[in-house]
Amino acid sequence: WNSKGELFLQFRSRLKKNHPQTWDSSCSGHLSTGQDYYEAAIRELEEEIGLDETQTKAIRPVFKVKSCPETEQEHVWLYEMVHDGPFQLQAEEIEDGRFFSQNDIQKMISENPVQFAPSFVYIWNLYLRQQKS
């Protein structure tokens, strides 16, 4: 999120094996051996969008998603933070990135959901439901 309440999304590289050239969460990745979810989140923020250790201290856990078909059988921890950029995008992973309002994301999903990685749409909808409760 930025200070205007817009969410930064990455446009996945055309070289990605799964869901190339789709909009996805700001950062994502897998645990390395011996790492916990928080440590992996920090590592991915550094690798994918170039935030340093001092900038990543503001992340906070939101919720956990159990493995399911919608997450390709992966366990997911969702974290969030506020940062206005700029970001240094990892070219091998990300072709583009920009901030979107919640309304714009909803409209884009409604009009053309295939422009998003399927797991993003699933987790986005879980997030919106949680915010309403």
Annotate the PLM regions.
Residues 52-62:
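A short coil-to-beta-strand element that immediately follows conserved catalytic motifs
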Residues 1-3, 81-82:
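Active-site beta-strand termini and strand-to-loop segments that position acidic
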Residues 21-23, 61-66, 70-133:
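Nudix hydrolase/Nudix homology domain
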Residues 8-10, 26, 48-51, 70-71, ...:
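Short acidic/polar alpha-helix capping motifs at helix-coil junctions
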Residues 46-54, 67, 84:
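Alpha-helix capping at helix-to-loop junctions
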Residues 3-43, 47:
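Conserved Nudix-box catalytic region and its N-terminal flanking loop in Nudix hydrolases
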